């Protein structure tokens, strides 16, 4: 029988350099796409108050992402909830849907450093492809609604503050202020009688201002009032505090005349201010979790010890019950048969 496979075995080699070139071309296209999207969405955010608030919502959900990457997420998938690359989702036991593989969310990540002609050091940026949870095979799972204890929330908020915090009588405070930072005294005064949500809303912008002042008694609080206001919004969104009273209609006025790079710098300042406060809070939450875990472990150990102590007592009690009505040395069960015979 004629061998029909011979003609199949004449295959030209595919130069590996072609694969490398294709990868480099794709990476370059993705990087250029990120630059274009970033410029476009930055201009939209700076000129549209509604779009600006949308950006803040995205940044609140992805608080560990840079301001530029939050802008890129807003431009590509503003409703994203959870992002990861192929490897991340594979570790979760799910996969990116076939129809979504060509629709990644592009973000920028720092790569290698290089030396510029003037001797300064620059950083190459590479585009990375991510996918939202909605683009994967993971079935919808209801997210557990964990409500933070209000006292724990406020205790975390005032942990290691950049300025002293002192309560004040309502008549000692400005009528429209629940809290106010005084740079000359490096002190934040907080109106007495407020509930947890009011304290959080009023105290967060003042903590941000105190962080900006960094102990400078001549600091002008008006310089960063907008940044502090936005940082407060980010924190409220993150920790489930009502944000309906926040109004960003004047945001375009703040950004008027700025270049996209300048706008992103201002957004980064807001993001960093919120993260400084959130980082201090996270330490308190972690300490609380560790304390609860230790208490649970101690309770489990105590329960185990009680069970071990009660075990021999139960066995001893059962032994005494069986011995009742039996003469010494008499086999178990004989006394029952003897009493039954006597009755007969």
For the regions a language model picked out, list residue spans one by one.
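N-terminal accessory/interface modules of nucleic-acid-binding and processing proteins
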Residues: 1-323, 328-343
């Amino acid at each position: 029988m004629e061998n029909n496979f011979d003609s199949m075995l004449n295959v030209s080699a595919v130069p590996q350099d072609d694969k490398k070139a294709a990868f480099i071309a794709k990476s370059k296209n993705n990087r250029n796409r990120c630059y274009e999207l970033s410029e476009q969405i930055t201009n939209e955010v700076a000129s549209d108050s509604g779009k600006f608030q949308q950006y803040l919502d995205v940044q609140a959900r992805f608080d560990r992402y840079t301001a530029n990457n939050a802008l890129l997420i807003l431009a590509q998938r503003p409703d994203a909830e959870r992002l990861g690359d192929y490897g991340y989702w594979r570790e979760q036991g799910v996969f990116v849907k076939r129809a979504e593989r060509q629709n990644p969310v592009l973000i920028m990540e720092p790569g290698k450093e290089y030396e510029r002609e003037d001797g300064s050091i620059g950083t190459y940026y590479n585009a990375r492809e991510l996918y939202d949870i909605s683009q994967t095979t993971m079935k919808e799972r209801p997210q557990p609604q964990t409500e933070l204890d209000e006292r724990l929330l406020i205790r975390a908020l005032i942990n290691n503050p950049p300025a002293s915090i002192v309560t004040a009588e309502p008549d000692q405070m400005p009528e429209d202020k629940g809290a106010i930072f005084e740079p000359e005294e490096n002190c934040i005064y907080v109106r007495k009688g407020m509930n947890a949500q009011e304290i959080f809303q009023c105290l967060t912008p003042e903590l941000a201002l105190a962080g900006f002042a960094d102990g400078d008694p001549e600091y002008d609080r008006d310089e960063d009032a907008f940044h502090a206001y936005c940082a407060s919004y980010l924190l409220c969104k993150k920790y489930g505090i009502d944000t309906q009273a926040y109004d960003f209609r004047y945001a375009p006025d703040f950004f008027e005349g700025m270049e996209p790079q300048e706008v992103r710098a201002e957004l980064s300042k807001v993001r960093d201010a919120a993260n400084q406060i959130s980082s201090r809070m996270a330490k308190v939450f972690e300490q609380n979790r560790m304390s609860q875990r230790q208490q649970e472990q101690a309770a489990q150990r105590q329960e185990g010890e009680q069970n071990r102590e009660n075990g021999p007592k139960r066995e001893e009690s059962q032994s005494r019950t069986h011995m009742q009505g039996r003469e010494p040395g008499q086999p178990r069960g004989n006394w029952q048969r003897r009493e039954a015979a006597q009755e007969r």
